[in-house]
């Protein structure tokens, strides 16, 4: 507990309980937490948590037999109804406590909902320790409470909570250094893990843990930014830098602050030295005002956008309630938490010394510090790396970490020189917003949303990566990154990004087969600045050779680091199914040519010469009349063209038949979790709303059958669906299966080998054309799809993407959905499954 701020007594009162959460205690002492969350219509997550678990063997046995489950085992009951394992199975231990979690229970089937509740009550009767039942999802809390009261009569009175914690903070006076070998080619992960004392239970429902987590995030941002700047200036390749904070709500042990950077093993010593000096300087001198204010602005943006304190799904609600029961953490609404994290009731000049006191209390070169080096087998050892860290810490740093003035300087940005007039205004059917056309032909889609203080934007220009001159096979995946490596309006790419960040603006470029986009989020007060930035990107770009060379070093590490992750394997399988496809999403660093930036500039020049062949989308908290004035002022300076280039033909023919590959695990930093079975299936399917709806229901069928097939194999899986409309209309399914952690599986189930999993997956995927689909499941899948669709329409990023697909590729993913859902039949779903079965397929087994 490091927070140095003294709070008034009224501030330390309870944060309250979110309106969607109902909590209480049954007559026998069992507590309950019921969350009404209809975001996943027809489904709910269930959990049972007890403060003192039985032995792992006994907990696992309970999944094999209970008093009211004599005809079939509990885990088989779940399997039959599509309730699969997570990576840890059904059960986990958190210190002395134990938690059962059952996700996506089909409560549309009342008998399944009742049986699941009865199962939890049966499990409760196995122990006298304090326990709680948690249910989150599409439920009626009052009816569920009545049912619990009735069932609880079969469970004897539980022991009263002792109120005492066995936790004791033990300070570590010297650091630990640990070295682990990984199978990557050249990636070294260097971590500093700092422990601190837990927050006392009586303060867990107060603002203090929220403010601590806020300061932790700020520390992470300051250190991450310094690492990126310092490594870049020294030429040390950096694939990524990560920060994590595990507070007292995350588990029973110490709080943990983790900083991890991914660099080249060849630079492990110099990277460790540099990292230590950065931490040492912060400990001694604290953060600077500019970087503190910048970090605060980034944090506010993260909160507003939902990246922090965002909307919770059922699993997150369950975790929140489990934490409240075990550790006393808050059950406050996201609005309350977001308000605390973004409050501006302390001036930066007053808060910075408090923040620096927090940093000083946290950082130490020896105490409560663990150094972890995850490196290839290349002769490095923990002792020498630990010594490098200690010596660098003691010496400190003589570097100047102050921000450049250009980080907030916008004077060099391109200023608008020509004005336009609004020519026409019509209703836009997909978003429900307004489509404006200006006198130079540029189109803008505007929609006011419930967002507060910010807006989403995306500038889409038609014409994809096939238009890059002399593009080589495997280069297209890098094209979108090239825009971020340009000098913009006299600012190098890093200063331009820092300028955006200091003004609360995010910006990311991307380029696909149909179009290129510049997208992000900005504060409403920065609308004019954003338009100047977009104009500067359009008008004043120069490739930065040093930035490209450094990017190439870092990207090689990133590719090595992510090798054989699910995303990497899926892109690999997609490439196998389309062997002649030139524009794969998979990155091959050996195919990245040194002249790509210059060739991309020709492509970007052609794109920005016809801004009227695209669409600017602005959705969020923007005043309509003010926006029109700003657009009339800015859009006249963008280039337009009367005639547009034709989209080039692209060959993406699917291979026929099925192929199977078996490879050994590695390289990569996935840590062994890549072991398993991966399957991809794809088929050409004409795009229309009827086929889209049938495809979504078909994937729900596949998901349920895979749960049944893999339950006795002790495996979990992820299913990803993909619908493409260009260059060819096709539908794809990717399945990634992995063994569960065995301690969370039923006693009579063991984690299977990849080859055992393969037989189960083949049983499902090889027979999808005849897959069963009951009337009850069919109706439930339709209702779930209807709800998902309605939820998606509330997601600004989804709506923007749907709009851009409509105007870039001519396909409508929204209009006619209700009619298609109403008319879809089981026969249509089976027909689409048959089409998938007759397409291309790949098995990729990693052992």
What name fits each language-model region?
Residues 702-706:
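Short Ser/Thr-interspersed hydrophobic loop/turn segments at strand-loop and sheet-helix junctions
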């Amino acid at each position: 507990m490091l927070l140095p701020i003294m709070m008034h007594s009224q501030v330390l009162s309870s944060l309250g309980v979110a309106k969607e959460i109902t909590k209480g205690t049954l007559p026998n002492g069992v507590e309950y937490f019921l969350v009404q969350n209809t975001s996943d219509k027809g489904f709910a997550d269930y959990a049972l948590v007890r403060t003192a678990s039985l032995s792992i063997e006994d907990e696992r046995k309970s999944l094999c037999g209970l008093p009211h489950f004599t005809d079939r085992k509990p885990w088989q009951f779940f399997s039959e109804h599509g309730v699969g394992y997570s990576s840890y199975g059904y059960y986990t231990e958190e210190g002395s406590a134990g938690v059962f979690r059952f996700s996506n229970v089909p409560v549309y089937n009342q008998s399944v909902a009742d049986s699941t509740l009865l199962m939890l009550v049966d499990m409760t009767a196995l122990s006298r320790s304090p326990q709680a039942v948690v249910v989150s999802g599409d439920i009626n809390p009052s009816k569920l409470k009545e049912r619990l009261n009735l069932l609880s009569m079969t469970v004897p009175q539980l022991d009263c909570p002792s109120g005492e914690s066995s936790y004791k903070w033990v300070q570590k006076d010297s650091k630990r250094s640990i070295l682990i070998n990984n199978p990557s080619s050249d990636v070294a992960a260097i971590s500093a893990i700092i422990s601190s004392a837990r927050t006392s239970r009586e303060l867990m429902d107060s603002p203090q843990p929220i403010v601590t987590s806020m300061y932790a995030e700020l520390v992470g941002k300051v250190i991450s930014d310094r690492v990126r700047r310092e490594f870049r200036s020294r030429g040390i390749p950096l694939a990524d830098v990560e920060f994590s904070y595990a507070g007292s709500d995350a588990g029973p042990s110490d709080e943990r602050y983790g900083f991890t950077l991914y660099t080249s093993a060849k630079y492990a010593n110099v990277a460790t030295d540099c990292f230590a000096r950065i931490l040492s300087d912060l400990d001694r001198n604290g953060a600077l005002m500019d970087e503190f204010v910048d970090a605060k602005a980034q944090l506010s943006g993260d909160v507003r956008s939902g990246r922090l304190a965002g909307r919770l799904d059922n699993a997150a609600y369950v975790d929140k309630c489990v934490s409240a029961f075990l550790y006393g953490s808050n059950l406050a609404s996201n609005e309350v938490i977001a308000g605390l994290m973004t409050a501006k009731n302390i001036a930066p000049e007053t808060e910075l010394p408090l923040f620096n006191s927090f940093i000083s209390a946290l950082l130490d070169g020896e105490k409560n510090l663990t150094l972890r080096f995850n490196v290839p087998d290349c002769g490095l050892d923990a002792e020498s790396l630990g010594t490098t860290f200690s010596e660098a810490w003691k010496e400190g740093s003589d570097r100047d970490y102050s921000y450049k003035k250009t980080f907030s300087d916008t004077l060099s940005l391109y200023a608008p020189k020509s004005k336009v007039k609004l020519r026409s205004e019509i209703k836009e059917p997909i978003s429900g917003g307004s489509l404006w056309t200006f006198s130079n032909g540029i189109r803008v889609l505007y929609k006011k949303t419930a967002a507060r203080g910010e807006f989403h934007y995306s500038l889409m220009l038609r014409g994809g990566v096939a238009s890059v001159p002399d593009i080589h096979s495997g280069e297209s995946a890098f094209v979108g990154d090239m825009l971020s490596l340009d000098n913009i309006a006299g600012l190098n790419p890093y200063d331009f990004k820092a300028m955006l960040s200091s003004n609360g603006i995010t910006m990311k470029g991307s380029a696909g087969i149909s179009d290129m986009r510049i997208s992000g989020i900005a504060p409403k007060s920065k609308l004019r600045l954003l338009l100047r930035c977009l104009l500067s990107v359009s008008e004043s770009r120069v490739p930065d050779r040093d930035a490209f060379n450094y990017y190439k070093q870092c990207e090689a590490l990133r590719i090595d680091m992510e090798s054989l992750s699910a995303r990497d394997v899926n892109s690999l399988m997609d490439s196998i199914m389309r062997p002649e496809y030139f524009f794969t999403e998979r990155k091959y660093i050996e195919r990245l040519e040194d002249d790509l930036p210059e060739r991309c500039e020709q492509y970007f020049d052609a794109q920005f010469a016809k801004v009227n062949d695209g669409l600017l989308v602005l959705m969020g908290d923007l005043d309509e009349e003010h926006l029109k004035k700003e657009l009339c002022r800015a859009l006249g300076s963008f280039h337009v063209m009367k005639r547009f280039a034709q989209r080039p033909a692209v060959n993406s023919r699917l291979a026929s038949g099925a192929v199977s590959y078996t490879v050994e695990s590695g390289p990569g930093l996935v840590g062994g979790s890549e072991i398993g079975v991966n399957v991809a299936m794809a088929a050409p399917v004409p795009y229309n709303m009827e086929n889209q709806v049938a495809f979504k229901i078909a994937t729900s069928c596949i998901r349920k059958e895979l749960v049944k097939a893999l339950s006795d194999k002790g495996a979990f899986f992820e299913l990803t669906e993909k619908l493409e409309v260009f260059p060819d209309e096709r539908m794809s399914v990717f399945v990634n299966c992995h063994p569960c952690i065995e301690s969370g599986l039923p006693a009579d189930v063991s984690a299977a080998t990849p080859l055992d999993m393969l037989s189960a997956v083949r049983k499902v995927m090889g027979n999808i054309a005849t897959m069963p689909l009951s009337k009850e499941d069919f109706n439930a899948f339709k209702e779930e799809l209807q709800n998902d669709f309605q939820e998606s329409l509330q997601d600004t990023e989804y709506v923007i993407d749907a709009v851009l697909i409509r105007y870039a590729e001519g396909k409508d993913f929204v209009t006619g959905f209700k009619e298609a859902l109403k008319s879809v039949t089981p026969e249509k779903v089976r027909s689409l499954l048959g089409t998938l079965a007759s397409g291309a397929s790949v098995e990729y087994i990693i052992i």
